């Protein structure tokens, strides 16, 4: 799942995933508020309820009540960390990256028009994130 307010980036991201044969079902949401509501639907009391396996959250989502770091904090606090989750952003601010680690983000991908090499590197590490054995990593 991609949570990002830039519709053009939705297309760039989907194209890169397609080129890499990533077996991800892409659902693009435009705001952290919308994503928070969807997570409430995905994580009911039923543990067998289907939920996203991987979530890419934009750091700065225009028109949202809170940023990507706060969304990750809410998801991990309210729903547990049952999925791979991290930030995708053009920012390389070390303070923001540290905040993301603290709230439970597993990765940080630097956003660009040529996102494919970063996603390819991310996919090599994916099993470690699923098994909670992979270290936090910034993909530049």
Regions found by a protein language model. Give the residues of each.
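Alpha4 helix (beta4-alpha4-beta5 surface) of REC/receiver domains from two-component response regulators
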Residues: 66, 70, 91-109, 113, ...
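A short, hydrophobic beta-strand element within the central beta-sheet of small alpha/beta folds
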Residues: 55, 82-94
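Acidic, metal-coordinating helix/loop segments flanking the phosphotransfer/catalytic sites
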Residues: 28-54, 118
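CheY-like receiver
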Residues: 116-140
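Alpha-helical interaction/dimerization surfaces of two-component signaling modules
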Residues: 15-20, 99
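Conserved acidic segment of CheY-like receiver
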Residues: 1-17
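Active-site residues of response regulator receiver
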Residues: 57-60
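Short amphipathic alpha-helix used as the core "switch/output" element in two-component signaling
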Residues: 66-81
């Amino acid at each position: 799942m991609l949570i990002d307010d830039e519709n053009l980036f939705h297309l760039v991201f989907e194209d890169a995933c397609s080129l890499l044969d990533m077996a991800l079902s892409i659902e693009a949401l435009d705001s952290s508020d919308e994503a928070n509501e969807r997570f409430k639907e995905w994580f009911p009391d039923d543990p067998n309820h289907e939920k996203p396996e991987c979530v890419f959250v934009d750091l700065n989502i225009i028109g949202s009540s809170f940023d990507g770091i706060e969304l990750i904090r809410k998801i991990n606090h309210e729903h547990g960390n049952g999925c791979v989750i991290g930030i995708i952003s053009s920012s390389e601010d070390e303070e923001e990256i540290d905040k993301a680690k603290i709230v439970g983000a597993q990765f940080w991908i630097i956003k660009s028009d040529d996102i494919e090499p970063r996603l390819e590197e991310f996919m090599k590490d994916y099993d470690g994130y699923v098994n909670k054995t992979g270290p936090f990593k910034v993909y530049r």
